[in-house]
Amino acid sequence: MASSMLSSAAVVTSPAQATMVAPFTGLKSSAAFPVTRKANNDITSIASNGGRVSCMKVWPPVGKKKFETLSYLPDLTEVELGKEVDYLLRNKWIPCVEFELEHGFVYREHGSTPGYYDGRYWTMWKLPLFGCTDSAQVLKEVQECKTEYPNAFIRIIGFDNNRQVQCISFIAYKPPSFTGA
């Protein structure tokens, strides 16, 4: 009796087995993987601008303080700052202006390990510019901060309120008294 029940159950499950996916059979052959080529150290093969390679000299690596994003470039003009803020706004990030009166760069005064008091946290200028749609509004706030604190470092940061992270940060103004050393 038990054998007849077992065979009828096997008959019922056989149509379901016909629709199952084939089992995993292992990795594909190595013929499907690309063959590695000999490394070509010729710099002209890397650039594809018609054979003309134009390299831009970057900021000197020794004796210059590094700040935020783009710190290896010369100071940004008002037009370039506006373009960076437009990029920030296009990505739906919330702009915020911050300033620092003493040290506009990371420094370690109270130890050799990174910590809270090593120059990463600046004072916020007003509130973040929620709902801002124009880079001129942000640059106006930078100008007001410059007027109020002419000897301060000023940076613009962008927050992504969905991911709850700071996505961009760059220096908008360095005080005239700063020598860069």
UniProtKB/Swiss-Prot annotation:
Cystines in this chain: none
Gene3D superfamilies named among the record's database cross-references: Ribulose bisphosphate carboxylase, small subunit
GO molecular function, one term: ribulose-bisphosphate carboxylase activity
Transit peptide: 1-54
Presence of keyword Aminoacyl-tRNA synthetase: no
Subunit and interaction comment: Heterohexadecamer of 8 large and 8 small subunits.
Additional observations: The basic functional RuBisCO is composed of a large chain homodimer in a 'head-to-tail' conformation. In form I RuBisCO this homodimer is arranged in a barrel-like tetramer with the small subunits forming a tetrameric 'cap' on each end of the 'barrel'.
Protein name (database record): Ribulose bisphosphate carboxylase small subunit, chloroplastic 2
Source species: Brassica napus (Rape)
